[in-house]
Amino acid sequence: MARKKITLVGAGNIGGTLAHLALIKQLGDVVLFDIAQGMPNGKALDLLQTCPIEGVDFKVRGTNDYKDLENSDVVIVTAGVPRKPGMSRDDLLGINIKVMQTVGEGIKHNCPNAFVICITNPLDIMVNMLQKFSGVPDNKIVGMAGVLDSARFRTFLADELNVSVQQVQAYVMGGHGDTMVPLTKMSNVAGVSLEQLVKEGKLKQERLDAIVSRTRSGGGEIVALLKTGSAYYAPAAAGIQMAESFLKDKKMILPCAAKVKAGMYGLDEDLFVGVPTEISANGVRPIEVEISDKEREQLQVSINAVKDLNKAAAEILAK
């Protein structure tokens, strides 16, 4: 059976980490693409030399040529300008739309049947732009956001309660920004709801509120500490989890920025926004779950924020 081909567009910190994880998990041969001369080739050679140590046997190569995307099974896009201290994800809008246009055309001409995962910020708008320029169908393109945001929520809860993070089930919906919606009603620790933990005095409400707030600003916290870039280990791990669910037909239900159809979650138009999504060999399938009235109101605020950015993106394209 032919090995799968995974192409990573953008060979920076996230791209390089994605490549390493793909090799360790033995998902397939890896192509690292970047516009920087030599850089993807150097990283590919370095990664190739880990194979004897890791005990894996896959091909890794770097390139500056979009033709090398040909016949990719999965394309993960991280290309674009990363956040710097003081910048919001939205500040990247104008710059990264142009990047998505170039990348989208590269996908369209070389691997239109690939499963595409977008990680570039501002996420919900970039995945929309990437679909616009690539022509990839709704079920074959998705944005990585909710997996990462939910992982941050789970991490902070586990740390606060001093329990294994594996016992914490916590979910985040909505746009990948300050209006994201951590679902406190749905989240639990070993089956015990956060609401019950608050009632029992094991988790103070003010601490839960602080964790929700920290989750929303989790990316900015890392940007402020790094000073010269943004998170890359956890975003890469999230992207690989999504790719693996597709490649191995795991049918995992993960919070992702999928194309949600009008009528779901009160939407009056189709929109890329973070919701629980099944990822299988057939692609992505958004799922509607019951949420509280308060969470639905918060989700609407987040949806409106995504719509506003989509309008801003449309205005940029019209110029």
Swiss-Prot record:
NCBIfam families: MalateDH_bact, PRK06223.1. Its EC number is 1.1.1.37. Belongs to the LDH/MDH superfamily. MDH type 3 family. Keywords: NAD, Oxidoreductase, Tricarboxylic acid cycle. Gene3D superfamilies: Lactate dehydrogenase/glycoside hydrolase, family 4, C-terminal (3.90.110.10), NAD(P)-binding Rossmann-like Domain (3.40.50.720). One of its GO terms (biological process) is tricarboxylic acid cycle. Substrate binds at R83, R89, N121, R152. Catalyzes the reversible oxidation of malate to oxaloacetate. The active site is at H176 (proton acceptor). InterPro entries: L-lactate/malate_DH, Lactate/malate_DH_C, Lactate/malate_DH_N, Lactate_DH/Glyco_Ohase_4_C, Malate_DH_type3, NAD(P)-bd_dom_sf. It comes from the Bacteria. NAD(+) binds at G10, A11, G12, N13, I14, G15, D34, N96, I119, T120, N121. It catalyses: (S)-malate + NAD(+) = oxaloacetate + NADH + H(+). Transmembrane segments: none annotated. This is Malate dehydrogenase. GO terms for molecular function: L-lactate dehydrogenase activity; L-malate dehydrogenase (NAD+) activity. CDD domains: LDH-like_MDH. It is an enzyme of class 1 (oxidoreductase). The lineage of its organism: Bacteria, Pseudomonadati, Pseudomonadota, Gammaproteobacteria, Thiotrichales.
